[in-house]
């Protein structure tokens, strides 16, 4: 259940849309809530904050088993170490980091026709990046995370997130999250806004390099 992203500065064809006829934030929230309630009334189980599946779907089974994952395409049932992006602007995941193809369709075609990769840029992940990625993934998949457990799994025992907890406390006061030592749980009220809680652990947002 994806919301429409109006980015005319990036997608120039969107400039043809009369913005005065677009729903405002309150209307978008109401539409999302109605769609959410309708899908759940029909027997669909909510997966994360934007996916829905039948109760016997592999994605629901992965959710119950704590094995749900998330990639650039959304939620998934397989934690693949490598995800290859094929088309223009597609993002690929490698054990070492991420790569992205050139966005221009013509340039992409020329690279492929010449037998070359159409990769335009990439980024290598540090140990800190991998730790934060795991925390964000658990928050978005399980709506909960044990910071100590994730840190231990990444060989970073004793890692503390003081600044992140300050931000989370603001959300806790609004009833969106609950904090219990090193454990974080996103409440039912906060689930539609799970990305806000997860963003507390994204250091690249503050630098403009996300």
Name every feature range the model reports, one short phrase each.
Residues 1-156, 209:
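C-terminal scaffold of the Radical SAM
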Residues 48, 160, 180-181:
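A generic structural-conservation signal
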Residues 157-173:
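Short amphipathic alpha-helical interaction segments
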Residues 172-182:
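A short, conserved structural fragment
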Residues 183-187:
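Minor-groove-contacting beta-hairpin "wing" of winged helix-turn-helix DNA-binding domains
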Residues 189-210:
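Short, amphipathic alpha-helical interaction segments positioned at domain boundaries
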